[in-house]
């Protein structure tokens, strides 16, 4: 998901997506440890998506405080 798409969502929706992505990341890491993961690049994609979403949330927090 691109940053522009994330900015269109509400903060609550973003937080919900972060939660689901963290669960997916946990499962991907578990699959990696057990040797079942085929697409290892997916871990990187999920981590970057979480970071993008957290960045948008933080930008909103800072813009409200200023």
Swiss-Prot record:
The keyword Ribonucleoprotein applies. It holds the Pfam family Ribosomal_L29. GO terms for biological process: translation. GO terms for cellular component: cytosolic large ribosomal subunit. GO terms for molecular function: structural constituent of ribosome. SUPFAM superfamilies: Ribosomal protein L29 (L29p) (SSF46561). Keywords: Ribonucleoprotein, Ribosomal protein. Belongs to the universal ribosomal protein uL29 family. This is Large ribosomal subunit protein uL29. It comes from Oceanobacillus iheyensis (strain DSM 14371 / CIP 107618 / JCM 11309 / KCTC 3954 / HTE831). The lineage of its organism: Bacteria, Bacillati, Bacillota, Bacilli, Bacillales.
């Amino acid at each position: 998901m691109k940053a522009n798409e994330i900015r269109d969502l509400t903060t609550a929706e973003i937080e919900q997506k972060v939660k689901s992505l963290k669960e997916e990341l946990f499962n991907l890491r578990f699959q990696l440890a057990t040797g079942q993961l085929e697409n290892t690049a997916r871990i990187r994609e999920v981590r970057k998506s979480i970071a993008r979403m957290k960045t948008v949330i933080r930008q909103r927090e800072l813009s409200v405080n200023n």
